[in-house]
Amino acid sequence: MKKNLTNIYLIGPMGAGKTSVGSQLAKLTKRILYDSDKEIEKRTGADIAWIFEMEGEAGFRRREREMIEALCKLDNIILATGGGVVLDEKNRQQISETGVVIYLTASIDTQLKRIGQKGEMRRPLFIKNNSKEKLQQLNEIRKPLYQAMADLVYPTDDLNPRQLATQILVDIKQTYSDL
């Protein structure tokens, strides 16, 4: 049972549009958008790639868990999570208990296109050679976790962030009277 429905969490793979949709949700609701990866970078003063290089994935996931714990204590926020946030059971529990969880999906081709457009080929878990295979691997592992957490699911291949954000808010209001 959810304790708090005032937060909206966006989960899904890299390139699904979490930050783009989150930005529109924040504008429409007059809430603050947090991007967990950007918040980690702000707190540490280092970019995610550097953290992965110096501390490995385990070090990054520890920092991510601490950041999620801090952000989940806030009220009335929009949070765009990192794609791997679902790998940690504590993250899944905190997110599920403190807000509405929106799972944004995207095809591998859409993800590749968006990641390439943003110049994000340097993402730590994104291997430029075999990038399609790497995304498929990550999706196979993470998809069941995303699905288990999701309150609402939206495909974003034909994404118009503003229209999707508007639809999400309509659906949330129809589903949950607390928001």
UniProtKB/Swiss-Prot annotation:
Pathway, per record: Metabolic intermediate biosynthesis; chorismate biosynthesis; chorismate from D-erythrose 4-phosphate and phosphoenolpyruvate: step 5/7
A Pfam family assignment: SKI
Gene Ontology CC entries for this record: cytosol
Localization (cell): Cytoplasm
Top-rank lineage group of the source organism: Bacteria
Main subcellular localisation: cytoplasm
EC number: 2.7.1.71
Entry annotated with the keyword Magnesium: yes
Necessary cofactors: Mg(2+)
Binding site for Mg(2+): T19
Binding, substrate: D37, R61, G83, R142
Catalysed transformations (reactions): shikimate + ATP = 3-phosphoshikimate + ADP + H(+)
Quaternary state and interactors: Monomer.
Function: Catalyzes the specific phosphorylation of the 3-hydroxyl group of shikimic acid using ATP as a cosubstrate.
Name this polypeptide is given: Shikimate kinase
Organism encoding this protein: Coxiella burnetii (strain Dugway 5J108-111)
